[in-house]
Regions:
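Acidic, metal/ion-coordinating pockets
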Residues: 2-3, 7-327
Length: 327
């Protein structure tokens, strides 16, 4: 009976997320057009118009709290998280590129945990693959919850399913290529950064930290975003920072995200506050750039009954279409 109660609350929470997500998709969906001066511009689905399009979706935090394991656990002791995505699957699978923000780790060497440390079984990755995600954002403050080995195993788990990730480098941040996906003939670079790692970075050597972690080092971010701008048609940045449960961005967020636009970012999908924060469109060199300061939660057990904040029940599924032309 307890499992059914937990599942019902989870389903209702997911419905709340998706309803707001649909509103978010309608309200925030934008058409971006890159200028053609450098040859980085838009070709096409048809020979006549020579226009190519790429529909990109991204969502807020996927947090597997302790209360959700009861809903996912099966009679044989395995876990099935696929029902958690039931009402979003059709939307996410329809995207040309879907990016999921998985806030946790996947490590068989650590026990399952859902707060303050997060470590889920590999079935969560299976569920995300089944839902239609193509890329996973791991740039968040919980990625070291199972140590560096757990972070690297999380990357490996998604890699095996054909879902590359951002936010953790397998070998060396300074030597690894930026993730660039070719989507319908449009090259899309994706970068992720986290403000910190809940103090667990202290367990890493300075060398391991520099090699593997994608933090908010401005010099490195600037160089990476500028490199992405040169190599790709579109640059998406997913930073994690801000104040939890605050529905307005901090001045630090605003300043840094505008710097990212100046460095070459076209879209910024922000996260971390667990609530939705405002968006804005920025004009740069005659082009439209888009910032959403926080997409909120997508799947979690943060709700009115558990954290006394109804805004944690609301999240966005961003729906952005890019267009590339050759003149």
């Amino acid at each position: 009976m307890l499992d059914r109660i937990i599942y019902k609350k989870t389903t209702l929470a997911c419905l709340a997320f998706i309803l707001l997500s649909l509103l978010g998709a309608a309200f925030y969906g934008l058409l971006f057009e890159k200028a053609s001066s450098s040859g980085k511009t838009q070709q096409s689905k048809t020979q006549s118009s020579k226009v190519k399009t790429a529909r990109v979706m991204a969502n807020g935090d996927i947090l597997i709290h302790n209360g959700l394991y009861g809903s996912a656990e099966q009679a044989d002791g395995t876990y099935d998280f696929k029902p958690f995505f039931e009402y979003a699957k059709d939307w996410i699978s329809s995207a040309d590129l879907a990016i999921g923000d998985y806030e946790g780790t996947i490590s068989p060497d650590y026990p399952l945990a859902g707060y303050p440390l997060f470590n889920a079984p590999s079935e969560i990755a299976d569920a995300m693959k089944d839902t239609g995600y193509d890329v996973v954002d791991l740039a968040h403050n919980h990625i070291l919850d199972s140590g560096l080995s757990g972070a690297l195993n999380t990357v490996k788990t998604f890699d095996k399913l054909g879902m590359p990730s951002i936010g953790v480098y397998k070998k060396d941040r300074d030597k690894e290529d930026i993730l660039i996906k070719n989507v319908n003939g449009i090259k899309i670079a994706i970068l992720g950064y986290s403000y910190a790692y809940n103090g667990l970075e202290a367990n890493l050597s300075a060398e391991d930290y520099e090699k593997h972690m994608s933090d908010l080092n401005e010099d490195k971010m600037k160089a990476e975003i500028q490199e992405a701008e040169k190599k790709a048609d579109v640059t998406i940045v997913m930073p994690q920072m801000g104040v939890e449960y605050r529905r307005e961005p901090t001045q630090e967020q605003v300043t840094l995200y505008h710097k990212m636009i100046d460095w070459g970012a076209d879209v910024i999908f922000g996260g971390h506050p667990h609530v939705v924060e405002p968006s804005e469109t920025v004009e740069k060199d005659g082009e439209k750039k888009f910032i959403i300061y926080s997409m909120g939660n997508f799947i979690s057990n943060q709700r009115l009954e558990t954290v006394d904040d109804i805004w944690t029940e609301r999240g966005l599924l961003m729906d952005v279409t890019f267009e590339k032309k050759n003149h």
